[in-house]
Every structure is written in structure tokens, then in C-alpha cells.
Regions:
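Gram-negative and organellar
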Residues: 1-216
Length: 216
């Protein structure tokens, strides 16, 4: 279930929302998740725009005969975001994002953590193509040692994600099949590196995607 509202108040766009989901498993503990929050957006002059958000989550799992530890990961979460976009020229714009979230579970070990996010992006609106380049960093700091992994080491994770996307009108390449230039090809590449103080969580990934979109 999702309920949302978009409105304008005091020159700002506001979007409060509420979500609820429930999973009934035949052979595992049932789970219920409730979330709510609000997002806001406003501009300053013609070049600056700001967005922000707050989110709250409450996740619960019930004990049953098949899973008598589900309740241990019941958690309350709070999240905050703030973003700034700036238009340098008709071609170049930038975006900076900050985020913080906190999760508190019944059993602290391996479940309680704080997350700090930072991202930087550059958008290039060339006449011949649109290119978006961004890099995001995320730091996870756990609050208590997880004895099932390393009882003498407090886990801390660092994740760096770099991606680049190119969008181009098919009509620039094959005008015969896209005379109105409203069919686009999208190419993207993403590189993700995750490092942790416990090597069990180290990873490195690369992904590529190709898609087509059409506007009417």
C-alpha cells in the first residue's frame, strides 16, 4: 500500500508519503514494514535548485516454529538527504548530494549501523548527445561487533560507485527511421567497489546496459 500527496507550500514543492507492506510466508516468519516521509524541492534564482527529504521506517518479523530469530532484526530507521543542483551554462550543470541514515535493531550485533553518503555529478547537454557522469561514496559504520563474523573487529564498509550514461537521438545516426528525433538510445556503464574491515564483504562489480526510449 502506498499513499502520496504532491503539493506546494510557501514556494516549495512538498511530497509526503506513507507505505505499508506485509509478507505472509508459508514456511518462514511473517514480516511487516511501515514507512513514511516527506520530500521537498525549491529553487533560488535561475541557476540553483535544492531538494531534501526525510524518511522513517519500521520493519518487524514475527517468530514462528520455522524461524525463531526473525524478531532479532526488527529495526527502526531514519534517513535524511540534501541535494543541490547548479546550472553553469546551457550545456554544463552539476549536482551534489549528501545523505545520512541510522538503523537500530533489537539485536545490535551485525544489524545496527549508520550510513553517510556523498555524491557528485556532472551533466553535459551537448547538441549531439546528453552525457551524465556521477560518482557516489557511501560509508557504513556498525555499532557493535558481530561475533558470527569477527568478534574482535568492528565492521566498517566503504562503497564507491562510478557511472556514466550517454543518451543520443537515433535520428542523428539514422535520420530515415527517426525523422522527428524522438527515439533515443541509452548506453550506461557502472563500476562498484566495496571494501570492508571484514573481508567477507569486499566486492567489485561492473555492469553495462543498453535501452531505447521514445517520446510522443
Amino acid at each position: 500500500l502506498t499513499l502520496g500527496l504532491d503539493t506546494v507550500l510557501g514556494g516549495q514543492s512538498l511530497s509526503p508519503y506513507y507505505t505499508m507492506s506485509k509478507s505472509d510466508y508459508h514456511t518462514d516468519a511473517d514480516s511487516v514494514s511501515i514507512g513514511m516521509g516527506v520530500g521537498g524541492f525549491f529553487t533560488v534564482g535561475e541557476r540553483h535548485s535544492f531538494s531534501y527529504g526525510y524518511s522513517y521506517s519500521d520493519s518487524k518479523g514475527n517468530h514462528n516454529s520455522s524461524d525463531d530469530t526473525a524478531r532479532e532484526t526488527n529495526s527502526i530507521g531514519h534517513g535524511y538527504t540534501f541535494n543541490h543542483d547548479y546550472i553553469f551554462t546551457e550545456i554544463i550543470s552539476t549536482s551534489i548530494g549528501l545523505g545520512y541514515s541510522d538503523s537500530d535493531a533489537i539485536v545490535d550485533a551485525g544489524n545496527d549501523y549508520e550510513t553517510y553518503d556523498f555524491s557528485l555529478g556532472v551533466n553535459l547537454s551537448f547538441p549531439w548527445a546528453y552525457i551524465a557522469i556521477s560518482n557516489g561514496m557511501s560509508f557504513n559504520d556498525y555499532k557493535k561487533e558481530d561475533s558470527s563474523v569477527a568478534s574482535d573487529r568492528l565492521r566498517s564498509d566503504f562503497t564507491n560507485t562510478f557511472d556514466i550514461m550517454l543518451t543520443k537521438a537515433i535520428g542523428d545516426i539514422l535520420p530515415a527511421i527517426d525523422q522527428n528525433r524522438n527515439l533515443f538510445i541509452n548506453l550506461s556503464y557502472e563500476n562498484g567497489i566495496s571494501e570492508a574491515t571484514t573481508f567477507n564483504y569486499d566486492s567489485h562489480s561492473d555492469s553495462f546496459s543498453l535501452s531505447f526510449t521514445k517520446s510522443f
